[in-house]
């Protein structure tokens, strides 16, 4: 997988050379390149921002600089649009993404733009690049999005700053046939998109074949799979520590009982902390023991999806 990152602080991404992601790059599984947006400026101050049209606080990242950069990295022919009346206003519809991780404003963060709100089960085409902007006012980045994007051959991340990037940037590249995503990583705002990009990048790349030392370690994680739940608690040795014991069943050696205990704990934990995930479960995929546990937790499981009594 090829990954390009555009930022005014490319040094931030030196951390990607550490740990498993660093090893994945050494093995050739991932190629990560961080670019300085200012390299595409032409003025003495290397300016990448300007005042907001219509007034307001802060500065907005300029489309001219971004377009020169993205045209080159996406290998597109530079174009100048003299009349944009035929381009539909993308502010009316988002594609994917939602929280707030970007810059000081709602656009710099980490979510998908207006055209990202419609989630899809279809993985991005492996042939074409996917352009991703963090944006706190976009749809929320989820494990499902990470799974879909892990099938892409080329990801290009753009990190916003200040009050964010000009809204016409993602709008224009969608009209050029580029798969553009805007995502948020949570309901909060950061100083820039770098942190959000790092979060998404790690969530995506760890799903690549050969990335994890033990592929089975990601199978039962929180939010993973069709009927996603929060993961059960984990323990290691010693069996008793400072008066707190590991649950006896985990020491029994009975794998079936261990599996059932962990499954029941995952259901109970999800019921307490994320009941919305229980509501999304497909009851036809629940076994008899799952149904019994959910009913004991106060859920009705006779319909297509569980419903709290």
Task: Describe the function of each predicted region.
Residues 62-94, 104, 116-161, 209:
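S-adenosyl-L-methionine/SAH cofactor-binding core of RNA-modifying enzymes
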């Amino acid at each position: 997988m090829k990954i390009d990152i555009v930022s005014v602080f490319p040094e931030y991404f030196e951390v990607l050379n550490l740990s498993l992601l660093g090893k994945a790059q050494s093995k050739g599984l991932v190629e990560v390149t961080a670019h300085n947006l200012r390299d595409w400026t032409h003025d003495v101050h290397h300016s990448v921002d300007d005042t907001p049209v219509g007034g307001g606080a802060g500065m907005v990242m300029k489309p001219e600089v971004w377009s020169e950069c993205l045209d080159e990295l996406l290998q597109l022919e530079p174009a100048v649009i003299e009349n944009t009346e035929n381009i539909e206003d993308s502010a009316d519809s988002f594609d994917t993404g939602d929280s707030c991780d970007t810059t000081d404003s709602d656009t710099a963060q980490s979510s998908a733009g207006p055209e990202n709100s419609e989630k899809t089960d279809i993985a991005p085409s492996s042939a074409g690049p996917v352009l991703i902007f963090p944006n706190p006012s976009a749809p929320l980045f989820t494990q499902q999005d990470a799974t879909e994007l892990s099938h892409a051959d080329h990801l290009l991340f753009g990190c916003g700053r200040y009050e964010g990037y000009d809204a016409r940037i993602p709008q224009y590249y969608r009209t050029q046939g580029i798969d553009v995503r805007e995502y948020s990583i949570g309901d909060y705002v950061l100083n820039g998109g770098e942190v959000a990009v790092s979060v998404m990048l790690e969530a995506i790349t760890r799903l690549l074949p050969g990335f994890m030392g033990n592929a089975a370690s990601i199978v039962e994680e929180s939010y993973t799979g069709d009927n996603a739940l929060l993961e059960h608690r984990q323990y290691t040795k010693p069996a008793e520590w400072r008066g707190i014991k590991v649950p006896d069943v985990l020491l029994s050696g009975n794998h079936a009982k261990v599996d059932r205990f962990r499954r029941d704990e995952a259901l109970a934990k999800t019921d307490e902390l994320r009941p919305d995930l229980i509501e999304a479960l497909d009851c036809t995929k629940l076994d008899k023991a799952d149904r019994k546990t959910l009913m004991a937790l106060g859920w009705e499981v006779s319909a297509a999806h569980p419903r709290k009594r």
